[in-house]
Amino acid sequence: MKSQRNGLAVDRREFLATTGGGLLAAAIPAAASVAVAAGGGAAPSPGTSGRAQTASTALRKIPIGVFDPVYDDLSLDEMLDKVSALGLEAMEIGTGGYPNSGHCPVDELLQDAGKAKAWKKKFEDRGIQVATLSCHGNPVHPDAKHAAKDAETFRKTVLLAERLDVKVIVGFSGCPGGSPSETQPNWITYRWPPEYAEMQDWQWKEKVIPYWKEAAKFARVHGIRRLAFEMHPKFVVYNPRTLMKLREAVGEEIGANCDLSHLFWQGCDPVEVIHFLGKQGAIFHAHMKDTVSFPENVAKYGVLNFAFDTGDLPQASETFRAVGYGHSASLWKSVVKAYMDTGYEGILSIENEDPILTGAVGVERAAYVLKNVRNELLGT
């Protein structure tokens, strides 16, 4: 059953999820105040008592930006005009792999320094920072051609980042097969029966760590010391523990793209995660994307039951939503505060994969929530 609000079809489950009893921002028109969406207060999430501090002008005004695939239907200039009109201050730009490179002609910019300068100037003329380049792929894929293609995309992205003076590259850790003979990735999260432990150990020792040691060395030579891995299911780095495992094995060039949408359903406390990683200087980038949980389906099917399409929602345990449509604005205020408290130096990059809201609307709604909670924290 769907209802109409603000001209949009909204699935009934949009109203079901709560955070500490607070209403979702989804249940409030976009023009309503964040204070109302937050249920009248900005209480920290569970497990964060004692961390609350009064807003201070010393807190950094973290730039709010957007990841460009949501605007794949627009030209570069059209996209930049749209982003500027929204008052966003930064962008994450795809350079290949899963995000593609629709707004960034990588080879052309590498071949011609003048074209690279002109490309970047389009952003600068609108007051938009090119904050990160993103090449999400699988450079340790068991298919050699697939792995080589994604590894080459990473290499070119490093060279382009050097040319553009961009300091952060975002991507995935990748996932190998479970043995030399496998032809597809094998995501192993449970070390039993014993052969799974053997396969997982082989993946890390023979594929993941050797590749990223060499890749980090290459990046370091070209002045890039921040490789931000999205902790994403189906890749070997999928939570804070596996991220730190790779960082400890490879070096401090490895850090997080902290996309909480992949951690909510795993049961992580978002503020706890930010403090845990942030205190170690291990957060290099942050995706702003929400997840809504449908308790009646979690009770029946468990959490490994994610939906990406609207047709799957009636049986889904979770799906992605725009910021504020899965958790209350007060929770997101605690999240932004945690980034400020831990000295995070990156941007808040809106990524829209909401199956209900269109891309443009999802970005606008997320930007509205994030701007308001940031302003409340800064007292502006």
Regions found by a protein language model. Give the residues of each.
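Catalytic domains of carbohydrate-active enzymes, especially glycoside hydrolases
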Residues: 79-97
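N-terminal secretory signal peptides
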Residues: 1-11, 36
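Active-site acidic/histidine proton-transfer and metal-coordination neighborhood
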Residues: 14, 19-32, 51-58, 78, ...
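Glycine-rich, proline-tolerant flexible connector loops at the mouths of alpha/beta enzymes
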Residues: 94-118
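Conserved, mostly hydrophobic/aromatic
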Residues: 66, 83, 91, 123, ...
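Acidic/histidine-rich catalytic cores of soluble enzymes
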Residues: 61, 90-91, 133, 192-326
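Short, acidic/polar
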Residues: 73-83, 149-158, 268-276, 332
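C-terminal segment of N-terminal export signals and the immediately downstream linker at the start
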Residues: 30-65, 69-72, 81-82
